[in-house]
């Protein structure tokens, strides 16, 4: 055979005289591995969920400023990002004592005369008898019952049975035999060898490495189009920190250091001496009892005086004759409402009025028309259909036709055609896939820990933050290099407030002149309510009044208008039961008794005439259902079918078909499989994943050639933070906390109060405020300790107050929660502030009651003041700053009786009247320790201004 020309352009074939091996392109290589993700920074409120984030990620608690790092699946506290507050300014000096107070005021007005006694209430008239109600008319007769429905019709006769089927026709005769098959054809020619397979595709490009989270900077609120989810944005004007979550910038916290505390307010000047109290004037004679004045506005209830001795009950006077009916008096002023008196005896029941004449019984209504005839009974069920007649007998099968004659043998088939050319050989196997592209480079990681980083930790370019000191390291050439510290500098101590001006001393009040004995005053106008007077002397017991003569019985007076309801007074003593009065003459029947005429309603009985109306009376009972119709006669049995015709004789068998053409010769053998194509070229190396934005450090302004766009740079000498944008280093903010503001100048001392009238001057206000003492009492408190790698703050502790403690109180997030069916049953030891005040300091001591040995790692005792949330009663939040923390177990052996102390001063935390405060103690650790609890007695003192 001739040489075969390779159909592939520029192919380097290895040909021989029989075939050619085509070069095959190798398969496409696998994609390179995805570059490692940069670490993410999360911001939220409270302790992070264990399901949030991956190892190496960061979390900022915006409520406390605590920074956490995820290590081996656990969020470990690293430290606080907020700078320390500046120191408080010095307390201003105490003001000078105020001058003496002004002259005393004129003495108070004399006491108002007592109110006259209230008149007795008249007897209530007898109630008239109620008339009898007339009799009700009789009800009309019920209509007659309807007739029974008619009997249902008889059912229809059943259908006639079907006629039997006709018999089957006889079978057709058999077909003649087929002729013999022709001879098999010759085998076909073997097919050509298949073509060489194509070269495999080029391997895929490796995946791009994933960017790390970016830290962005700007002035003001970030644009929604800025950054990607997980990025952090710092507003350099305010220090606010935002995180992009779900495409939205969410405000999380503020990184600027706290402003220094304001200097203490200067002491208030001493209060001036109060003038001596003037001598009390002689008590004036009691004025004549004044007329009852117009009722004044009801004053506040004064202190209740002693109840005077009860006067003797005077003899009951004879009932006087009823005087002529007086003119109706004006409605008196509404008196104070007396307490409900004891219930009087029940009056005698009045005589029953005469029974009204019974109304005539209405005429009996005419008998109602006969009710409509009952509905016709339902038609009886249709009779059952007659049975289907028996099917006629099947006709006899006709005789089978005679078998046809065997056909002549068919002619021998023609020789089969040459077999088809064998299929082209399969394409050679595709070349091996190209090698996987190189892995993209990882983004830089941010790591956290306690103390100097281990040389084995991290990779070149990674950042490490020591959460104990705030020192920032970068790994360069396998070595951790100290770069800077991110903790803000402590604010300068505020200047001492200027000394308040000395308050003017109040003038000493002149001694009041002894008051002259007052003349009996005219009846005064109703004045404003005065202050509650001193308790009056118990009045002398009154003389028993003379018994009055019995008056004549007068005409019964008209019922007076109902007076305004008096205010409720004190419950009076139960009076003696009066003698039963003589039964009065039966008065004219009260108007209400006329209602007895209503008895005419009995005439309504004529309504029975309604029966005359042709309206259908009560519906007659439904007629009985008609009897079920008789079952129809059974249908006649069907006729027997006719016997089938005898089958026709079978046709003579056809001549056998010509023998089939011989089979096509066997297909030639399949061509050999083409040679395997050459291995494909190695896929191109995947692009290197973008390196996470780098954080660089240096002293001074960064060089334009340093770093790449998106990198950050921290000037160690100033704390200025730069971001490289379009090849230019742009200052963004300063990560060091702002220096605390200078303490405000102390307020000028208040001017001394003017001396009070008459009374001896009070001692000046003490220089310091009250102290609220707290103690866990007679029983020591066992506080739980977090004993895991990295340590942490225990969420279970104890509250305590004035000699009592409640152990096993659990924080909910950062708050104390005394609500709900479980927490609501815990003792709530909060107390309420009775006035506005300010917390100035907190001190705590802890006395060990169970020895602690071989700890050698710090265990910090924490006590903090919590305040109830106004919007959520029963839930208390921690007061920032009102916390004391000290180490109780960092030496080899802590024996029973050892005392540890801590104090925080210079606080200025306002507390409003009505606020509820509670003190809570728990522990904090920084590493794995072997102690599960620390036990002892806790005491604290809270200083208020």
UniProtKB/Swiss-Prot annotation:
Residues 703-712 have a biased composition (Polar residues). InterPro entries: Collagen, Collagen_superfamily, Exosporium_BclB. It is found in: Virion. Glycans are attached at residues 211, 442, 716. Residues 109-145, 168-208, 488-687, 736-754 have a biased composition (Basic and acidic residues). May be hydroxylated on lysine by the viral-encoded procollagen-lysine,2-oxoglutarate 5-dioxygenase. GO terms for cellular component: extracellular space; virion component. Residues 83-142, 146-205, 257-376, 383-442, 488-547, 554-613, 635-694 form the Collagen-like domain. Residues 756-765 have a biased composition (Low complexity). The keyword Glycoprotein applies. Keywords: Collagen, Glycoprotein, Hydroxylation, Repeat, Virion. Residues 80-226, 257-441, 488-712, 733-768 are annotated as: Disordered. May participate in the formation of a layer of cross-linked glycosylated fibrils at the viral surface thus giving it a hairy-like appearance. This is Collagen-like protein 1. The lineage of its organism: Viruses, Varidnaviria, Bamfordvirae, Nucleocytoviricota, Megaviricetes.
């Amino acid at each position: 055979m001739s040489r075969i020309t390779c159909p592939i352009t520029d192919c380097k074939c290895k040909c021989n005289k029989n075939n050619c091996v085509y070069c095959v392109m190798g398969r496409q290589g696998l994609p390179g591995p995805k570059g490692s993700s940069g670490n993410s920074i999360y911001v939220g409120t409270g302790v992070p969920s264990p399901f949030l984030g991956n190892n190496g990620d960061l979390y900022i608690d915006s409520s406390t400023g605590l920074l956490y790092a995820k290590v081996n699946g656990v969020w470990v506290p690293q430290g606080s990002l907020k700078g320390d507050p500046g120191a408080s300014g010095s307390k201003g000096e105490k003001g000078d004592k105020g001058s003496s107070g002004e002259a005393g005021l004129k003495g108070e007005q004399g006491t108002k005369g007592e109110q006259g006694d209230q008149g007795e209430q008249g007897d209530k008239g007898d109630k008239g008898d109620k008339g009898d109600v007339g009799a009700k008319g009789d009800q009309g007769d019920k209509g007659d019952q309807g007739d029974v429905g008619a009997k249902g019709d008889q059912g229809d006769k059943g259908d006639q049975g079907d006629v039997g089927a006709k018999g089957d026709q006889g079978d057709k005769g058999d077909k003649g035999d087929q002729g013999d098959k022709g001879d098999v054809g010759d085998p076909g020619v073997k097919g050509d060898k298949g073509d060489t397979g194509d070269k495999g595709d080029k391997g895929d490009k490796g995946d791009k490495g994933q960017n790390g989270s970016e830290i962005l900077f700007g002035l003001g609120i970030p644009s929604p189009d800025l950054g990607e989810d997980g990025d952090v944005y710092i507003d350099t004007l305010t220090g606010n920190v935002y995180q992009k979550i779900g495409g939205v910038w969410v405000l999380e916290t503020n990184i600027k250091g706290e402003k220094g505390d304001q200097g203490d307010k200067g002491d208030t000047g001493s209060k001036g001496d109060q003038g001596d109290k003037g001598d009390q004037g002689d008590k004036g004679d009691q004025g004549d009892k004044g007329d009852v004045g117009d009722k004044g506005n009801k004053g506040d209830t004064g202190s209740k005086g002693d109840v005077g001795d009860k006067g003797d009950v005077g003899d009951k006077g004879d009932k006087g004759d009823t005087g002529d009916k007086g003119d109706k008096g004006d409605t008196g002023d509404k008196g104070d409402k007396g307490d409900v008196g004891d219930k009087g005896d029940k009056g005698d029941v009045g005589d029953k009025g005469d029974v009204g004449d019974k109304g005539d019984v209405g005429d009996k209504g005419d008998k109602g028309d006969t009710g409509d005839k009952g509905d016709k009974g339902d038609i009886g069920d249709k009779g059952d259909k007659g049975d289907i007649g028996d099917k006629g007998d099947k006709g006899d099968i006709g005789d089978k036709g005679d078998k046809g004659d065997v056909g002549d043998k068919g002619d021998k088939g023609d020789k089969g055609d040459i077999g088809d050319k064998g299929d082209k050989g399969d394409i050679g196997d595709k070349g091996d896939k190209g090698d996987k592209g190189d892995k993209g480079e990882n983004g830089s990681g941010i790591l956290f820990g306690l103390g100097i980083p281990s040389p084995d930790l991290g990779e070149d370019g990674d950042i490490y933050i020591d959460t104990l000191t705030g020192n920032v390291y970068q790994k360069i050439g396998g070595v951790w290099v100290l770069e800077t510290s991110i903790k803000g500098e402590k604010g300068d101590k505020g200047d001492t407030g200027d000394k308040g001006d000395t308050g003017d001393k109040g003038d000493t009040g002149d001694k009041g002149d002894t008051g002259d004995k007052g003349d009996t005053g005219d009846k005064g106008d109703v004045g404003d309510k005065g202050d509650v007077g001193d308790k009056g002397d118990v009045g002398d017991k009154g003389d028993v009044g003379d018994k009055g003569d019995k008056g004549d019985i007068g005409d019964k007076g008209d019922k007076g208008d109902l007076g305004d309801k008096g205010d409720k007074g004190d419950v009076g003593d139960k009076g003696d039961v009066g003698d039963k009065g003589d039964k009065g003459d039966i008065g004219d029947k009260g108007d209400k008794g006329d209602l007895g005429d209503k008895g005419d309603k009995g005439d309504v009985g004529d309504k029975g005439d309604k029966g005359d109306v042709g309206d259908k009376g009560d519906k007659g009972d439904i007629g009985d259902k008609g009897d079920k119709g008789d079952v129809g006669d059974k249908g006649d049995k069907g006729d027997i079918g006719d016997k089938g015709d005898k089958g026709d004789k079978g046709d003579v068998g056809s001549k056998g078909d010509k023998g089939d053409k011989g089979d096509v010769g066997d297909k030639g053998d399949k061509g050999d499989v083409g040679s395997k194509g050459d291995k494909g070229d190695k896929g191109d190396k995947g692009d290197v994943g973008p390196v996470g934005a780098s954080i660089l450090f240096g002293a001074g302004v960064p060089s334009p050639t340093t770093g790449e766009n998106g990198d950050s740079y921290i000037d160690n000498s100033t704390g200025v933070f730069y971001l490289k944008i379009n090849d230019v280093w742009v200052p963004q903010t300063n990560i060091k906390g702002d220096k605390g503001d200078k303490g405000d100048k102390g307020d000028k001392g208040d001017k001394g109060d003017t001396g009070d009238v008459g009374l001896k001057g009070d001692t000046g206000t003490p220089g310091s405020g009250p102290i609220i003492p707290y103690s866990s009492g007679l029983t020591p408190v066992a506080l739980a300790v977090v004993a895991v790698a990295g340590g942490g703050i225990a969420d279970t502790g104890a509250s305590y107050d004035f000699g009592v403690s409640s152990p096993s109180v659990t924080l909910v997030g950062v708050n104390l929660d005394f609500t709900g069916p479980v927490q609501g049953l815990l003792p709530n030891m909060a107390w309420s502030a009775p006035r506005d005040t300010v917390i100035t300091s907190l001190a705590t001591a802890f006395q060990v009651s169970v020895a602690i040995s071989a700890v050698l790692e710090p265990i910090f005792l924490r006590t903090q003041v919590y305040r109830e949330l106004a919007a959520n009663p029963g839930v208390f939040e921690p007061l920032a700053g009102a916390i004391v923390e000290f180490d109780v177990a960092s030496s080899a052996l802590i024996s029973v009786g050892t005392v540890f102390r801590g104090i925080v001063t210079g606080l200025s935390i306002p507390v409003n009247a009505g606020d509820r405060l509670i003190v809570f103690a728990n522990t904090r650790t920084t590493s794995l320790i072997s102690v599960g609890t620390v036990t002892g007695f806790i005491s604290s003192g809270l200083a208020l201004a």
